[in-house]
């Protein structure tokens, strides 16, 4: 989850660069033809792990069947590309904001940043033990996933759970 914040920011940054290109009169970009389906949009795709896997599998199969030097190219409208990248970034951030926010019951909140090998969230309250990691919170704030209220809650939670005066500052995790 922590790095998904960065991926969302990267997509938004790419959309921003394409907006600049559009302002300079560029109306399309050329991509490998096999990449066009990756620009598909819509919550029906984003919300379905199965549909995302199908899209990825199709893309990978197309990559394998092409011979080096024979990549077909296609033009993609810059507006379509910008919209796709921005929509994907917005969806990722919204998903993290709503699905990964954890609270401790004492008024503190922060994002779960990682999952264990069994698919369980690592952060939050677990059997009376509070777990928080600073790295994922930094990504969420730095990459604009956390809204203003969430950023304040993260700071308060870090003060409560990660600040250690004897250590001279903030620990990376509880």
Could you describe each region identified by the protein language model?
Residues 1-174:
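Acidic, mature catalytic/reactive cores of soluble proteins
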């Amino acid at each position: 989850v922590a790095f998904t914040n960065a991926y969302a920011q990267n997509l938004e940054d790419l959309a921003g660069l394409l907006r600049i290109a559009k302002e300079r009169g560029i109306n399309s970009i050329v991509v490998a033809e096999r990449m066009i389906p990756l620009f598909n949009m819509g919550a029906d795709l984003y919300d379905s792990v199965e549909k995302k896997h199908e899209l990825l599998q199709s893309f990978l199969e197309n990559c394998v069947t092409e011979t080096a030097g024979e990549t077909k190219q296609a033009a993609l409208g810059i507006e379509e590309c910008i919209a796709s990248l921005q929509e994907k970034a917005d969806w990722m951030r919204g998903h993290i904001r709503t699905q990964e926010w954890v609270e401790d019951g004492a008024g503190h909140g922060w994002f779960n940043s990682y999952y264990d090998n069994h698919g369980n969230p690592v952060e939050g309250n677990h059997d009376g033990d509070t777990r928080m990691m600073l790295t994922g919170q930094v990504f969420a704030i730095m990459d604009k996933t956390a809204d203003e209220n969430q950023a304040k809650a993260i700071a308060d939670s870090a003060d409560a759970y990660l600040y250690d005066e004897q250590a001279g500052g903030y620990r990376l995790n509880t």
